[in-house]
Amino acid sequence: MSGQETPREFTAQMSVRAGCWRLYVVLLNTTERWPEHCFGRPLPVPTFTERADALKALGFEPAPGAEWAWTEDTEKPDDPASAVVLIAATRVRSWTGAGQ
């Protein structure tokens, strides 16, 4: 064994809230504030490079082989006329010890 710790993996999610795309890393079992980045705009959707740069600024990087998955939700549950909300998620790993 090399003595190096394996980086912990987390889920990063991205959605539009309060008029801007926000990327955040979900830290479970902690009272710490989740690391978050606001892109400052509702459109266009942040590019892959912008998302990777935001993760890096938060101390994370995409996990090897991870891909972004997009899910559709609604603002008002059980209301078919409600506006659509897009949520993206991917696996990330900490390279700064965040969430430890």
Labelled PLM ranges:
Residues 61-100:
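Short, mixed-charge low-complexity intrinsically disordered segments
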Residues 31-46:
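A short, exposed loop/beta-hairpin motif centered on an aromatic-Gly-Thr core
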Residues 46-63:
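A short, charged, amphipathic alpha-helix used as a generic interaction element across diverse proteins
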Residues 9, 51, 85-86:
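Short, intrinsically disordered, low-complexity terminal segments
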Residues 1-21, 94-99:
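Short N-terminal "domain-start" leader segments
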Residues 17-33:
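Short aromatic-glycine-(Arg/Gly/Cys) micro-motifs in beta-strand/loop hairpins
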